Amino acid sequence: MSILSFGSGTITDDDTSGANGEGTGITLANVPGVSRTHRPDTPPVALSIAGSDSGGGAGAQADLKTFAAHRVHGATALTAITAQSTAAVRGVVVLEPDFVRLQIETVLGDLSVRSVKTGMLATRAIVDVVADLAAAGRLPQLVVDPVLVSSSGHPLMDPDGIEAYLTRLIPHALVVTPNLREAAALTDSPLEDLLSVPAMSAAAERIRSHGATYVVVKGGHLTDVAHDVVAGPEGTTVLEAARIDTRNDHGTGCSLSAAIAANLALGADGLTAIRRAKAFVARGLAGGASWTLGAGHGPIDHFGWSASP
């Protein structure tokens, strides 16, 4: 087991290794988590299949901000539209599965998509649409953020939909990024049984046994350190970051999975993409910690604005 730590202050990432251990020549400058050595003539493309957050903190909006922060062109296929603020979700309209498919196929038919991430899929029927496309090899470097349970613990997917994730979608994923509640749902375990790094590691391996290459179980704030446990071909890796005391944590899961997809689109290998994404979110949390956007949980600082002169 290896452990990597990220502080809450300045985070650097000088490792620009690609999938073959060679430098990609692509890093980011003045953006949380990574830096850029040169600009490609044409930016790579990442696709987000997710719901819309009208408050701009999570969902497809957080994904697009994350892609832009990495200078990756972001495309979207919306699964649902929410009436949402920093304080509450007042309504949700789920789009028809056939229209979700049409959005995805329209993007894939025009843009050279290098990576794809999923967020809120809302229904079993939409999970099946995405799984069918993944099985056909049309969703490259797929990152699955299994949005199954709300932050308050309310189920967002029925048991049939969870089964579809396990048997139809996760087998085609390069990376899966459940939080503790979602890991509990995917492993049919009580949440209280997952509140340790060894238990998180075991849950990650159970989910990975369904066919994913990497599984990142996000521990949040188990103690004064935020632990994420990664199960992958290299074994188990524990990513640590100092706890940041802020209410501005809306969309952290969306931003993490989008940052993984962005780094994959830029040429990083799986574990490097995960590590860079963890650093990106840690910097975003630190940067936006004192913001006062809205009455509830605000977004993170995707663009390093707080660090800018």
Q: In which residue ranges do the predicted regions lie?
A:
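Short pre-catalytic strand/loop immediately N-terminal to key active-site residues, enriched for Gly-Thr
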Residues: 49-55, 237-251
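Conserved phosphate/ATP/ADP-binding segment of small-molecule kinases
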Residues: 159-236
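Conserved N-terminal subdomain of the carbohydrate kinase-like
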Residues: 36-48, 60, 64-156, 303-306
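Phosphate-handling active-site elements
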Residues: 70-75, 237, 263-277
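Short boundary segments that mark the start of a structured unit
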Residues: 1-25
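Charged C-terminal helix
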Residues: 43, 94, 271-309
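Nucleotide and nucleotide-moiety/phosphate-recognizing core
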Residues: 125-140, 213, 227-236, 270-272
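Short, small-residue alpha-helix embedded
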Residues: 66, 184-185, 247-270
